[in-house]
């Protein structure tokens, strides 16, 4: 049998997208919508606006598998369901062939002086550095510009590499060569390990909580 990558969420159980059994399978894509499923990519700030083809936005879906609402939570239901369409909270894009790609979670998006920065994109680039074993990107408040954030990278180095200022400078130089200036991490913190779920997914929220506690905030 074949193993095909797909996509779905609890509110659209069990699945909304799948790579085709017969036909082209694209690396990094969750495939195309399954039959009777409608999908559109909408503006992150205004779900009534559809973004141009190839641009990132929030994934919105409609179909028989979309849930009817949250039990006894009418406000949450109203926030997530719009005329039968569900706002997924996932940032994605569609290519010219109708294949969809997941970019990141909306809640993890970083606002750098009005520019949208997606942590996963930066993490994928940093994983290409020979010294990096694991990495997580989050946004931290910019005290000079309320409502804006600065990019911070938590880095776990591979065995044999030293946690030095020289290594931080090397990583920043690597970022400057491979990222737009506003995406380059302003802060780099070395750690021996990153908080992860049982299946190995980095928990960015725990890192955000650590930063909040350092600022004296309650979490």
Feature locations, PLM:
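AMP-binding/adenylate-forming catalytic core of the ANL superfamily
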Residues: 63, 68-69, 91-182, 200, ...
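Conserved AMP-binding/adenylate-forming
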Residues: 1-6, 10-100, 107-109, 123, ...
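Solvent-exposed beta-strand sheet faces enriched in polar/charged residues
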Residues: 6, 42, 103, 138, ...
């Amino acid at each position: 049998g074949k193993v095909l990558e797909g996509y779905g969420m609890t509110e659209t159980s069990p699945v909304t997208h799948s790579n085709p059994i017969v036909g082209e399978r694209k690396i990094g894509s969750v495939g195309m919508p399954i039959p009777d499923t409608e999908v559109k990519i909408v503006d992150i700030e205004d779900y009534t606006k559809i973004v141009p083809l190839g641009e990132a936005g929030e994934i919105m879906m409609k179909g028989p598998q979309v849930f009817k609402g949250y039990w006894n939570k009418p406000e949450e239901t109203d926030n997530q369901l719009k005329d039968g369409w569900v706002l997924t909270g996932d940032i994605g894009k569609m290519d010219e062939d109708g294949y969809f790609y997941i970019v990141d979670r909306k809640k993890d998006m970083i606002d750098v002086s009005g520019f949208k920065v997606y942590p996963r994109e930066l993490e994928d680039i940093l994983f290409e550095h020979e010294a990096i074993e694991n990495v997580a990107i989050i946004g931290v408040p910019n005290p000079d510009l309320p409502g804006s954030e600065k990019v911070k990278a938590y880095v776990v180095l591979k065995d044999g590499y030293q946690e030095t200022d020289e290594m931080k400078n090397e990583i920043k130089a690597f970022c400057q060569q491979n990222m737009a200036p506003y995406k380059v991490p302003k802060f780099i913190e070395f750690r021996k390990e990153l908080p992860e779920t049982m299946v190995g997914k980095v928990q960015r929220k725990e890192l955000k909580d650590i930063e909040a506690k350092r600022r004296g905030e309650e979490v």
